[in-house]
Amino acid sequence: MRATEIRKNYQHLWKGGTLLLGMLMICSAAEQLWVTVYYGVPVWKEATTTLFCASDAKAYDTEVHNVWATHACVPTDPNPQEVKLENVTENFNMWKNNMVEQMHEDIISLWDQSLKPCVKLTPLCVTLNCTDLRNATNTTSSSWETMEKGEIKNCSFNITTSIRDKVQKEYALFYNLDVVPIDNASYRLISCNTSVITQACPKVSFEPIPIHYCAPAGFAILKCNDKKFNGTGPCTNVSTVQCTHGIRPVVSTQLLLNGSLAEEEIVIRSENFTNNAKTIIVQLNESVVINCTRPNNNTRKSINIGPGRALYTTGEIIGDIRQAHCNLSKTQWENTLEQIAIKLKEQFGNNKTIIFNPSSGGDPEIVTHSFNCGGEFFYCNSTQLFTWNDTRKLNNTGRNITLPCRIKQIINMWQEVGKAMYAPPIRGQIRCSSNITGLLLTRDGGKDTNGTEIFRPGGGDMRDNWRSELYKYKVVKIEPLGVAPTKAKRRVVQREKRAVGLGALFLGFLGAAGSTMGAASITLTVQARQLLSGIVQQQNNLLRAIEAQQHLLQLTVWGIKQLQARVLAVERYLRDQQLLGIWGCSGKLICTTTVPWNTSWSNKSLNEIWDNMTWMKWEREIDNYTHIIYSLIEQSQNQQEKNEQELLALDKWASLWNWFDITKWLWYIKIFIMIVGGLIGLRIVFVVLSIVNRVRQGYSPLSFQTHLPAQRGPDRPDGIEEEGGERDRDRSGPLVDGFLAIIWVDLRSLCLFSYHRLRDLLLIVTRIVELLGRRGWGVLKYWWNLLQYWIQELKNSAVSLLNATAIAVAEGTDRVIEILQRAFRAVLHIPVRIRQGLERALL
């Protein structure tokens, strides 16, 4: 009876259970994400690559060949673009910057290349008979104008002429720094025993010309614009440029000349301030002008030292022989040292006493301030500049500081050991004006300094000179390929391409680096276009540079770098395009895939990824899994191509025109023969079956062409209902003539036979399915009713248990309350009982 009641009320329980099951399935189902490829994302990685140069075509004299070979550089961009990267923080390290090493190697190569065609002075390594030049002292001049005795030597020597077996005597003037005494009157050139001396070609100019280092296509240069950036650590004001500012390759020691200035206060930079072996680079905020001159009016003469070789030396000095010197403002310099001392105190402690002392010794290039002025190499005594403390100031009492300078013509190449250069003398007087924009300092070591820090001028490693200008730059490699999870899955359908919004074109290269991934996705076309346009522009620049120097029939260092940059850019672009092609994403900025996103790569939600993260942060998070994702995309694309190939193999039936291809006629003939053979065999089988059937009925076959009675069904016997009645008229099958007629009859019989058998089979299957369905539905209803019955029983049992528990609890509660009431009444009656007892006692 109860089971019947449950069966009647199962409908609303069924609906409720279905709804609950659906809600559970929706809540438990995790949304599937798929890998999507993006091309042109604003992502970069630190890299080292070959940089090429750009220079202003009007910055040098076309009549002379500057040693920097800037004629081989591409022209500078008249409108350079610098794009500020919002919300981007990047780490810089000026002490581990490959741009510095690359510039250093370039300068070495340029000097070597400029000296290759020049004359080797090996024949000049002979004994020199030298005497001091007359009028080498001038008592009427001031102390700094008086040239020291023996500063210029008049030397005679025997030299081979254009005829090798003929020797003649020649004389020349040499500076004292360029000769070494052998005995009292005999000398030799200073570097003959250690180096190969090469004379600089007559028309080579050492005048520094600004060089812009540029990144090839596919790379970018990041620039730190923090005004107080110390060279290492994070920088929050970052922009991207294609080329650096113009850097003058000034070769100098102690003082940095004609560089860039700090925008606000003086900035001091060092790799490690606590290590006194590390150089301190000081960048000034105001330049100090230094004017240098060689007052001597020199003449230059040529000495033939062999076939096709000439030595250029100083012939004579017209007028008084005076000391070369440099002048700078004492007030400006003292103010500069005071500001530097303040910054050094901030770094090393305000309780420290800052002292500047001259160099402690070493090579002339280190002890003095060495630089090139108008083609001559000056070595100026900087003692007056670096004799300073808070109380003593400078010893010089005049308005200007005058530095006495000496000149050398044989220069030890600061780049390499075993090479020296002879700088030919310059005619006439020499004057040059430079701006002091920085200093190179070293700190004295020792533990017991008594609260004093002593700083001395340093230098010698030209990398520090380049580092003082390149500290704000770093080269990065653009990684335009990015992968991220989305809800979209690749479908093998064809859709029209949509045009990218024009608004993206107004954003600069990498301009969306600080934006979220969702916002940056609309600027993909900018990066994609500039990668290719940069390569094309690089190609045009290269061809222009080669055309400009084609008369030389050789490439300079810069020309080789142009080729390297071009090849590198093409290789990177082709590699990216190859990956896109392998993934089936050619020509697409956003490409969906069939690779499911694995939460082990990143378990962040879509909102966290696309609304809160930049592409740079996202790339750092999945960087370890990038190769795995790439391989999975490639495998997925390979599988898809195999599937498409199998599908296309079936597509040959789509075109009826292919059926008439002459190459398939033999196949058609083969099929026709098989069909005819099958029909003939089928005809034979039917004839045999007909004969067997007739024989079983008692007839004998007379002829295959005889009319045979048609078979009747079981519901139509041969006679009438009464016995002995007349037979019904027999039906006979038609006798046909001709091969095609026989084929038609056989095909018709075969089709009818197949139709009847298939119909019977279908009816049987339908009956079976119907029977199974009924029984299955009955079983399901039975189990459902049974489940509802037991659920109701469990519910009733639970209700009964709850009721019994409630009754037991209620009864127990009543008993407890009754006991408490009795106890309370007993307590209340105690005074009454006491009173009654007292009354009884009194009575």
Swiss-Prot record:
Positions occupied by motif YXXL motif: 699-702
Positions annotated as glycosylated: 87, 129, 135, 138, 154, 158, 184, 193, 230, 237, 258, 272, 285, 291, 297, 327, 351, 381, 389, 395, 400, 435, 450, 598, 603, 612, 624
One biological process term in Gene Ontology: fusion of virus membrane with host plasma membrane
Stretches the record annotates as Disordered: 706-731
Gene3D superfamilies referenced in this protein's UniProt entry, alphabetically: 1.10.287.210, Human immunodeficiency virus 1, Gp160, envelope glycoprotein, Single helix bin
Modification after translation: Highly glycosylated by host. The high number of glycan on the protein is reffered to as 'glycan shield' because it contributes to hide protein sequence from adaptive immune system. Palmitoylation of the transmembrane protein and of Env polyprotein (prior to its proteolytic cleavage) is essential for their association with host cell membrane lipid rafts. Palmitoylation is therefore required for envelope trafficking to classical lipid rafts, but not for viral replication.
Motif (Di-leucine internalization motif): 842-843
Site entry (Cleavage), positions: 498-499
Chain spans, region V3: 292-325
Listed CDD domains: HIV-1-like_HR1-HR2
Protein name according to UniProt: Envelope glycoprotein gp160
Species lineage: Viruses, Riboviria, Pararnavirae, Artverviricota, Revtraviricetes
